[in-house]
Amino acid sequence: VPPATVQALADLHAAGLHVVPITGRPVGWSVPFASAWAVDAIVAENGSVALVQGGVQSQIGRQPSPDGRFVLSKLYQQDTATRQANHARMQQVAQRIVREVPGATASTDSVGRETDIAIDHSEFAHLPPAQIAEVVRIMQSEGMNATVSSIHINGWYGSHHKLDGARWI
């Protein structure tokens, strides 16, 4: 993330605004940024999970713990049982995509994902439009939502999306 962007977030926060970046990146990728940046929360994985400063679900804000460190809480749009079932299904879909679509690979940040899967199409790999469309078709045929970002094809179960995540938190 460019330093000018991080500074802009800090300036907004210093001006008294609630700052909540929204990303398609995984929650695992977001943890160091949520801890270091002057933000109230980060919504990750296309709106399904939030890292909230302060450790209290109903409160947004950077609130230190008694020892002075900032505490992060993970909040999810889906309950634990639903997330676990969806995660298992999504891993099967990801394996199918890698098997059936030539050149398809899981994104390098897949390890930190809890509520979606991501197939790389332009970050480190290059998939032509026909193969991107095939990945989307497979995800949708498995009942998943699918979206194509500038670098990944993301798939997930549930009705959430980035705008929904912004409104939720």
Where are the regions a protein language model picked out?
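Active-site phosphate-binding/coordination module
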Residues: 3-109
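Conserved acidic, metal-coordinating active-site core of Asp-based
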Residues: 92-169
